[in-house]
Swiss-Prot record:
Phylogenetic lineage: Bacteria, Bacillati, Bacillota, Clostridia, Eubacteriales
Protein name (database record): Putative competence-damage inducible protein
CDD domains reported in the protein's UniProt record: cinA
NCBIfam families listed in its UniProt record: cinA_nterm, molyb_syn, PncC_domain, PRK00549.1
Lineage: superkingdom: Bacteria
PANTHER family documented for this protein: NICOTINAMIDE-NUCLEOTIDE AMIDOHYDROLASE PNCC (PTHR13939), NMN AMIDOHYDROLASE-LIKE PROTEIN YFAY (PTHR13939:SF0)
Alphabetized InterPro entries for the sequence: CinA (IPR050101), CinA-like_C (IPR036653), CinA_C (IPR008136), CinA_KH (IPR041424), Competence-induced_CinA (IPR008135), MoaB/Mog-like_dom_sf (IPR036425), MoaB/Mog_dom (IPR001453)
């Protein structure tokens, strides 16, 4: 089955709203083995939407739309789809009552504009919306399937998960299961080179690498006539990949790197404090996202100036004068200083040149040092990155977390 995603809304074209719906739907369709061939964004215009539907159905069996189901006059998706399938719009009494009930929860009464949201093509399957006033629907005709969903993600995603996926799984006549491996420390091209034999010989399961900032994910997808069989096909491929990539794999599924690190700290009861310069608190922020981290995370200090490094972390003035703030020597003294002042097992530090200014020939923009102190032992890592200030700061945090993980495992 081939699919296209049409996201409707002039606000998307103007850049007022980020289109996360296409990403979410594409990912979910890939999980059940449906190929997405095209994404389109269309303004609130009936003629353009009709043309897009005609173009999409020339090569796709399935078109999924999001947006344009609201109560205003420029919400035209439903009308356009009904016209394309040559269906009349009729009032659906059950939906009308549900919309009225939802409005009453907010002390609002039914208006003619809201009443419009209860009209649907005569021959369609209506998808209830417990999170809003815009139900979706599925319409099938002449081997064409259109699935029409609301635009707000908090309405669309539950509808897609609870209604659309079960509907589509019945059409595929097979079970598709996926497992995601999360990798950091090596880039997508290095991962692809290391597992090239697997990528070149893949059939079922398939293995697909995806690059993200600071990490790579590998999605292993298997198709079979049962869930048990599909999962069993994944096992030997996953084992082979783990043997090749080793500790570059930090987790699987939706696991985050900071979650892995925090779990290690909590399970081993290792207390930690952070001393940050170029990352300005981002590292501490990542760690404290994890529930339960308060039992081991004692302190986070942002020591941006040389004076604060000296006064707060006991970094030696002589070290700063001899090596400058951006140096492995200072990174190590920062890590040890925060650990000793906070009384923790671990101290971790970041210092570097994030840009856009401040770089020199000897200390260019993107030069970063991560210092680590663990129960009397010290470690340091030097990094060199190119990119804008935010990228360099974010990648430094990822590398710091991974540096800590590898030295704890």
């Amino acid at each position: 089955m081939k699919a296209e995603i049409l996201c409707v809304g002039t606000e998307l074209l103007l850049g007022d709203i980020v289109n996360t719906n296409a990403q979410y739907i594409s990912k979910e369709l890939a999980n059940i083995g449906i190929e997405v061939y095209h994404h389109s964004v269309i303004g609130d215009n009936e003629n353009r939407l009709l043309k897009e539907l005609e173009r999409a159905f020339n090569y796709c069996d399935l078109v999924i739309t999001t947006g344009g189901l609201g109560p205003t006059k420029d919400d035209l998706t439903k009308e356009s789809v009904a016209k394309f399938f040559q269906e009349d719009l009729v009032l659906h009494e059950k939906s009308l009552k549900q919309i009225e009930k939802r409005l009453s929860c907010f002390n609002k009464s039914m208006t003619e504009s809201n009443r419009k949201q209860a009209y649907f093509p005569k021959n369609c399957e209506i998808l209830e919306n417990p999170n809003g006033t815009a139900p979706g629907f599925i319409i099938e005709k002449d081997n064409k399937i259109a699935i029409i969903l609301p635009g707000p993600p908090y309405e669309m995603q539950p509808m897609f998960e609870n209604k659309v996926i079960p509907y589509l799984e019945k059409l595929t006549n097979s079970t598709i299961k996926s497992k995601v491996l999360r990798i950091t420390g090596i880039g997508e091209s290095d991962v692809a080179d290391l597992i090239s034999d697997i990528l070149e010989s893949q059939t079922n399961p398939t293995v697909a690498p995806y690059a993200k900032q600071g990490e790579t994910t590998l999605r292993i997808t298997a198709k079979a006539n049962s869930e048990e069989k599909a999962l069993s096909l994944i096992v030997p491929i996953e084992k082979k990949i783990r043997q090749i990539l080793g500790d570059n794999i930090y987790g699987s599924g939706e696991t985050l790197l900071e979650e892995v690190v925090a779990n290690i700290l909590v399970k081993r009861n290792l207390t930690i404090a952070t001393a940050e310069s170029c990352t300005g608190g981002l590292l501490a922020g990542k760690l404290i996202n994890f529930p339960g981290i308060s039992s081991v995370f004692l302190e986070g200090a942002i020591t941006y100036s040389n004076e604060s490094k000296i006064n707060r972390l006991n970094v030696k003035k002589e070290t700063l004068e001899k090596y400058t703030a951006v140096s492995k020597e200072v990174a190590l003294e920062m890590a040890e200083g925060i650990a000793k002042s906070a009384g923790t097992n671990i101290g971790i530090s970041t210092t570097g040149v994030a840009g856009p200014g401040g770089g020199t020939y000897d200390k260019p923009i993107g030069l970063i040092y991560i210092g680590l102190y663990i129960n009397g032992k010290t470690f340091v890592e030097e990094l060199n990155y190119s990119g804008n200030r935010q990228f360099i700061r974010n990648i430094t945090v990822t590398r710091a977390l991974d540096f800590l993980r590898r030295n704890l495992e």
